[in-house]
Each structure stands twice: as C-alpha cells, then as structure tokens.
Amino acid sequence: MKPIFFSIFTVFLFASCNNSQKVKPFWTEEKSPEVVGQKLIDDFFTRDNFKVIDSYGFTAIHYAEACAAFGVARMADVLNNKQAIQQLADKYMKVITDSIPNTADHVDANVYGILPFELYYLTGETAFLDQAKYLADVQWENPRSDGLSNQTRFWIDDVWMIGSLQTEAYRITKDPVYIERAALEIQAYLKRLQQPNGLFYHGPGIPFCWGRGNGWVAAGLAEVLSELPKENPYYPAILEGYIKMMNALVKYQAPNGMWRQLVDVEEAWYETSSTAMFGYAMLMGVKYGILTDEKYTQTYQKAWLALTDYITNDGKVTDVCIGTGQQNDIDYYLNRPRVTGDFHGQAPTLWFAWALLE
C-alpha cells in the first residue's frame, strides 16, 4: 500500500467526480446495505481459486468474477474495510505476478480492466494501472472505419463490457479519450438495438427481452452517464435512451419489487441478477439528478427490499439465471435453471449496495 499517494489521489479524484446525492436510509437493519454488502464481501473471500474462461476463442479471468471483485473493491472502500481492500489487492496482484493470461481480444476479456483500475485507485500500485490501461487501450488499437472498437459485436452485454471499462479508465486517468470512446460506442448500440418499448432483444431475430441481458445495458448506461460531460455530442442520445429504458422498467417491475427472467412476460419467474442491475441503474440516475420523479426512487427502493429477501445468511444471492445463449424459443428462457451464489448475481448486488451508501 502507498498511503501518501492514496490520500492525495483520493482527494483529487473525489474533487473531480460528478456530484451525487446521498441516499436516506429506507431499510431495516437486516436489509441495510452495510450488513448485506459485508456478507457478500465475506462470501467472496471464501472462493480461493480464480474462475477462468478458456473458450470462445479467448482466455481471461471470468468477467463475472471481475465484476464481483470490482463490487467488493467499491464496497470495501465505502465501508472503510482496509483489510478487505488489502486482501483483494494481494489476490489480484497474483494475476500480474503469476502471469495469468488475458488475451485482451474480446469484450469479456478486456472488461477485467475495471478491477485493476479500481485497485489502483485504492492502493496506488502502478502495476494495476499499467494492466488496466493496456486493456482499455488495446480495445481501440485498430478501430473500425466508423471509429468503433474492433471488438464491437452489437450484443447487448457489450454496453456494460465496453462502456464500464472506458468509463472507469476516464474516471481514474481523467483522459477524455476514454469517455469519448464510451459515448461513441454506446450511442451506436442504442441507435441499433433499442426497441420502441425501451427494452432490448437478446439478439438479432430473438424477440425476447432477457432480464440479465437488459441488466447489462441498464448498468452500462448508468455508468457512462455518471461521468459523461453534458457537452459531449452523444450525451442527449444516451440520456434519451437511458430514460426510455428506465420508464419501461418502472412499467414492468412486478408488484413485489422484483423483475422477471423475461422482463415483459408476466409468467416468467423472478430473477435476481437483473433485479440488482436494474435497481442499481435506476438508483444511479436518481443520485446524479437525472431521474427526478419520485416514481424512480420508489422503484429502486422496492427493488432493494425485494432483492434482499433472496440472499442467504452466508451472503449468497439465490435465483440467479445461469449463463444463457440466444435461442428463438420462449420456453428456453422460461425454463432456464436457477443457481445460488453465482458471480452474475453477487456482482450487481454489491454494486447496488455500494451505490446506496456512496
């Protein structure tokens, strides 16, 4: 750790961030984000081994683990849990020192960079910054003729995978090239993929609004808007797409506060990872003064109070949809297995808890 660097850097970063509003507590003690967040941190550190993807033509620490560790870092920071920060830094420094591979040629590999950016912010260890900047920069090493990343797939997941990495790079380095990349990319995805009802199909010719797929979009839009300067030429389009999606989510939230495996299908089961992502995305909009109507506050509050009923005493989120490919068959989505403790559910629950406290 480098405490002198940490204190100076923290003051600089805090002073330069967009202003956000504190959330007034609306929860009981057992549902408090402090209690829930610490449970999820404790659970995270029971998992010793790295979860590695070595398929689909690339190799990297699994994006879901990276997103969960990113959530642990933010949560530990807001709780002032220095032991957890050090433990996290020690664990993921091994990715560098032990040369755990990252082929850095796919959005699911490069998004790992959000974690070392956050660890650099918390510790001042430049090895994390070097690793993170490489993953952000190589994403635009050979851009397409339209300026988009050569990793562009127009899969809805990418709104988070690309948007969060480039936004985090801007947040930490303050180099505007990163947020300009994020804005260019995200407006192109919105223009091509957002449906008239504000939601997103899982894929071309797949007319189903899968919960977690839409969750990646919602969280990614919120992340970009939390840093995107209003004078950016793409700000109006991204803001419009975000608000359009948030209004759809208000409409489709179940009476109990959850969202469903298929967002707009009432017979679909209640799914936690999407609920956490949607709640986080809406909360961020309220905190940054984008969503001012009381209905948005009521919606994210209902989501948190419902979501926390799906967390075990040892900090595992239940009813998480397993990884899901694209299928033109509604029963495929309605019958997907549910698991407990998967990083896809742990990660956004940590983000949501952090945002309630930050």
Model feature map: region roles:
Residues 128-164:
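Asp-box/WD-like beta-propeller blade repeats and closely related beta-sheet repeat scaffolds
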Residues 59-65, 69-72, 105-120, 154-166, ...:
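Aromatic-lined, polymer-binding surfaces characteristic
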Residues 49, 80, 97-101, 124, ...:
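Helix-capping and short linker residues that terminate individual alpha-solenoid repeat units
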Residues 50-57, 148-149, 201, 205:
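Active-site flanking loop/helix segments enriched in acidic
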Residues 1-24:
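Bacterial Sec-dependent N-terminal signal peptides
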Residues 25-66, 78-87, 91-94, 98-123, ...:
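CBM-like carbohydrate-recognition segments
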Residues 37, 41-45, 86-88, 131-145, ...:
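Acidic-glycine-rich active-site phosphate/pyrophosphate-binding loop
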Residues 156-157, 167-262, 268-279, 291-325, ...:
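Extended ligand-binding clefts on enzyme/binding-domain cores
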